[in-house]
Structures are given as C-alpha cells and as structure tokens.
Swiss-Prot record:
Enzyme Commission identifier(s): 3.1.26.4
Organism whose genome encodes this protein: Parasynechococcus marenigrum (strain WH8102)
UniProt cross-references to InterPro entries, sorted A to Z: RNase_HII, RNase_HII/HIII, RNase_HII/HIII_dom, RNaseH-like_sf, RNaseH_sf
Matching CDD domains: RNase_HII_bacteria_HII_like
Pfam family, one: RNase_HII
Domain RNase H type-2: 36-224
Name of the protein in question: Ribonuclease HII
Main location: cytoplasm
Organism ancestry: Bacteria, Bacillati, Cyanobacteriota, Cyanophyceae, Synechococcales
Localization: Cytoplasm
Amino acid sequence: MGLKPPLKTRNPRNPAVAGVGLRPQPLLIDSIPCHRGVAGVDEVGRGCLFGPVFAGAVVLEAANASRLQQEGLTDSKRLSARRRGDLVPLIEHEAEAWGLGQSSTREIDRLGIRPATELAMLRALQRLPNRPELVLVDGNLPLRPWTGEQRSIVAGDQHSLAIAAASVIAKQCRDALMQRLSQRFPGYGLERHAGYGTALHRAALLDLGPSALHRRSFLRRFLG
C-alpha cells in the first residue's frame, strides 16, 4: 500500500516558510493526518541543569493515533509518571515507527543548547527505518539540520498526536535515566526533579558543587 501524500508545506530554507512558528487552530490535532510519511518530534530536558537532552520521533497512522487518543495520549507534561509508563508500551505497539536520540552534557556545553537539542532531534529521526516525508516539530523554530519538509507547531504536543507520543517516550526514557544516575550522583535529588533547577537542586549545587554531568554552561550565572 502506497504512502498518502504529505501535507503541503515549503522547504525550511525558504525565508517565507509556510506554517513555521504559526499558532495552530484549536482542532489541529484532528486536522493533521497521521500516516507513514509524517513524523512528530519533540525534546525533553532542554532546560535542565544536569544530564543530556533527549528527543523522540514517532510516526503514527490515523487509526492507531485515534486508539492512543482514546487511551489518554496528550502532552507528556500533563501526564503523571505512572500514566506515561502505561502509555509507552502502547505507543511502541501502535506506532508505525519510533526513535530516540540524545545529546550529551559535553555536547550541550560545546555547541549550545539549541544546536544540541536539534542534534538530539536529528538523531531520533535518523533512528526511524524510513525517512519521513514531513516532520512536525514542537515549538516555533525550524529544525535547522533537517533538510526535508517540516512544520513547526507552537504547543505541538497539545495539537499533534505524533508529537505528543514523541514527548511521552522521550520523557519516560530520560526520567528513567535520571533515576539510575541518582544512584551514581547522590545528594542532588535527581530522582525527584530529573535535573531541573528546583530549589532543592540549587541548594545541593551550592553544598556539593557540580558533578561531572552538570551543564557548566548553565551554571556560570548561578555558581559564578
């Protein structure tokens, strides 16, 4: 069975990119078709003080996306850890394809957070068995390393089921890594905040200093 034609959009290298950064209509989650040629991509951990940034990429067909929506799939930030854990195997089963990518703390400090996040997204997309015809990117900025067709969607994880699925998989995997790393780097409370800059985390940094996996480029203003 052949692929359905992708949504019409312009190449992101064109200054007059159609759809990039535009706020979607309320029912966009229903108006963007899910099929083999469309992948949703999202990142997790961009604003953390510790650890890598993760990205997920998911390709969903319409019927499978509808089943996941009935199971409560939405933006990962709106879901409890238990609910995300329940959804991950369902997403893996229903997705036409999915992939994960990450950029290390060293890459974040060397490249900067935006290029490192884009690299994680690119790696997630490269893990898909087939190159998608269209990539839906969460946010208002284009994915610069991606040379194919793409569309940036503000609050995309609330409006595209493929992006929502990507955010759930990425967050669940990153949080699981933070749980393991909390044993290697005790005292920072990583098991509680997953590396975000909470009051507990900042107090621990002042007391213990940064670990090998803290983002030095994020801590300069905080620690001096």
